[in-house]
Every structure is written in structure tokens, then in C-alpha cells.
Amino acid sequence: MPTMQRVAITGSTGLIGNALVGHLKSEGYTVQRLVRRPSRSAEEITWDPQAGTVDLEALAGVDAIIHLAGAGVGDKRWTKKYKSEILNSRLLGTTTIANAVNAVKPSVFISASAIGWYGETGNRAVIESDRAGEDFLAAVCREWEGAADLVKDVRTVKIRTGLVLDPTGGALGRMLPLFRFGLGGKLGSGKQWWSWITLHDQIRAIVFALESKIEGPMNLTSPNPVTNQEFTAGLARALHRPALFPAPAIALKIALGGFSTEILGSKKVLPQALMDAGFVFDYPHIAPALAALVD
């Protein structure tokens, strides 16, 4: 049985949250989902990030709180209104949860962040100690992590997540239909670095953070980032299809607006904190990872 018996999670219906809930339950944890409506069972706890409230009585006695909730950065076009939603959903939600953590004092608080923290890195590899970038998502991440830093006297881990790979969602889920029909190719120049991690290793790394002594920022990426050209060529090989249809940068900018900077931008991020703590990836290299994911 796990040493931490009871875990509360926000964002439990997302790609990562849903997989994490299933894994934790299979490992013997009691999992409670934070929901934005009246709770329907003991497995649910009501919270309202807009109002800044959490049912603290229901949350009392929890061993760990994992905060994953936030508006998806790739879900909608980056209008001024949606950019505000991206920021505010993280700032209000994390501030609310941080205050709840300070009230109930679990053993550990794990708060989502992203490798967007680093901004554009070009060909330069970055680790957790590197400073934040200057673009929109870097600014979001600074405020997001700043809200998590409101927590005092509780071990806190800020998980800077990279490109999470799973065939059921995220970037890979969107790319697969085109690549299965042989219509895929590199995006833009293809020279931009993609710092990726399988959903499988993402979940393992979060559980590692839960059960170990690690704290502070933690990059959740493979130790072997690849260029977009390497990624798309590898995906085509895994599917036994050609990759003959590149998407020009201008087309992506027209189709995706501001979010295109995340597709075309370069982030070469290494998981130094995880490696220093002894975490071992099941899928450290892209070729076997993609082969397993599309099998």
C-alpha cells in the first residue's frame, strides 16, 4: 500500500488528470476529485476557483493535493479574451488551491506548470535553474508558479510539463489522422526542438514526485528532445507512411494564430531534477516511444 493514502486532484477530467486518477487507484490510493459543482459522493470535493473557495472540511486530512486544472493553451484560437482565460484560469485556480493547501497542510503539493516557462530557447538546452523567458506563455508560467509559491511549510513540486504524447489526445492525437493517411510532414522549418514525454512516463514522474523527497521546479520531458523534423519523420516511420507534406510556417500562423508560436518555436528542455533524483524513463528515446504509441 502507498504511504500516502489519500490524494485530491484538480483537472481530473483532462488527458493527464484522467490517466493519473486511474493509475493512482490501481496502486491503492484513495482519490478525490475536485469538481466545480456540488459533490455527488465522498470521491468528490467542491471548489470554485472564480470565488476562491474550496470545501475545506471535505479536504481536511488529505495526504497530497495535485493541481492540474487550467484552460488548454491549444484548445482555442488565442484571442485577447482567450489569452486572459489562459492566465486567469491558472492564477485564480492556483491561488485558491494554494490557500487550501496552507489551511489543511498535506504532506505534499504538486502544481502544474509548463516548459513554456523558458520561452524560446533555440538550440540551447535549458534546465530547471534557467530563468523564465519573455513571451506570453513564459509570463503566464511566472504568475502560475508564483501563485504556487504562496504555499508555506509544505513540500511543493512545480511540474513543468512538455509535449505529452498519447494517441488519444494532445498534439499526437491531432497529428495521427493525417499521418495515417500519408499526409503528414514537418511543421515550418522542422528545425525547432520539441521536448516531449509519453503520457506513461508523465504519470510515472508525477507519482515519483508524490512519493519521493523532490521539491521545487521539475521538468517533465524526455532526456532526449528531438527536432520537429526528427519527430515527424519518426512518426511516419512508426506508421510505415511517407512524410511528404510539410506545413509551411505561414499556413500555421494563419490557421492557429498566436498558438502557432508554440508549434514553430524551439524549446530544448532537459529533466535535470528528475535525473538527479534517480528517476528512470521507460521511454527516453522517440523511436521506441512512437512505435509503442501507434502500435
Describe these PLM feature segments.
Residues 95-135:
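Conserved Rossmann-fold NAD(P)-dependent oxidoreductase catalytic core, especially the SDR/UDP-sugar
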Residues 113, 146-167:
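Conserved beta-loop-beta element that borders a ligand/cofactor-binding pocket
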Residues 176-184, 192-226:
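Alpha-helical substrate-binding/gating segment
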Residues 211-258, 291:
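Mid/C-terminal beta-alpha module of Rossmann-like enzyme folds, strongest
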